[in-house]
C-alpha cells in the first residue's frame, strides 16, 4: 500500500521530511504543506513540536498588491480631513495677516484673536497630517504582511 498525504489523502510517492513525525503523519505533499502552513499560521508541528524550516520572503515593493479593504474607514476620514484643512489653510494664509493686524489700532486682544483664528487651521492640518502618517504606517505594515510568502524546506 502506497503512503498517502495526511492532508489531502491522495497517494504519495516522494518522501520529504518536514518534521520528526513518524508513520502516516510524515507523508505530505509539498503544496499541501505550504497551504497548511499558510492556513494555520503554525511554525511548528503540533504532534512532534519540531519547528518547520520556514523562510519568509517579502515580495519586492514594485510587486506589492494593495487592498482598500485593509484600509480602515477612519484612515479615509482622516485623509479627507487633512485635505480639507490643508486647502482651508492655504486659502486663509493667502489673506495677509499682517495687514489685518497693522490696520487694527493697538488692540492686543484683537491681534491675539486674529492670530488664533488664522493659526487654528494650520494646527488642525498638522494634527491631521500626523494622524494620516500614523495610519499610512499601519497600512504599510499590514500590506507588508499580506505581500510576504513563506517557503518551507525539508529538515
From Swiss-Prot:
One of its GO terms (molecular function) is transferase activity. Residues 96-115 are lumenal. Keywords: Host endosome, Host Golgi apparatus, Host membrane, Host-virus interaction, Inhibition of host adaptive immune response by virus, Inhibition of host MHC class I molecule presentation by virus, Membrane, Metal-binding, Modulation of host ubiquitin pathway by viral E3 ligase, Modulation of host ubiquitin pathway by virus, Transferase, Transmembrane, Transmembrane helix, Ubl conjugation pathway, Viral immunoevasion, Zinc, Zinc-finger. Its main location: host cell. The keyword Zinc applies. Coiled coil: none annotated. Residues 1-74, 137-155 are cytoplasmic. PROSITE patterns: ZF_RING_CH. GO terms for biological process: symbiont-mediated perturbation of host ubiquitin-like protein modification; symbiont-mediated suppression of host antigen processing and presentation of peptide antigen via MHC class I. A zinc finger (RING-CH-type) spans 1-55. It is found in: Host membrane; Host Golgi apparatus, Host trans-Golgi network membrane; Host early endosome membrane. It is a multi-pass membrane protein. GO terms for cellular component: host cell endosome; host cell Golgi apparatus; host cell membrane; membrane. Zn(2+) 1 binds at residues 5, 8, 29, 32. Belongs to the poxviridae LAP protein family. This is E3 ubiquitin-protein ligase LAP. It comes from Swinepox virus (strain Kasza).
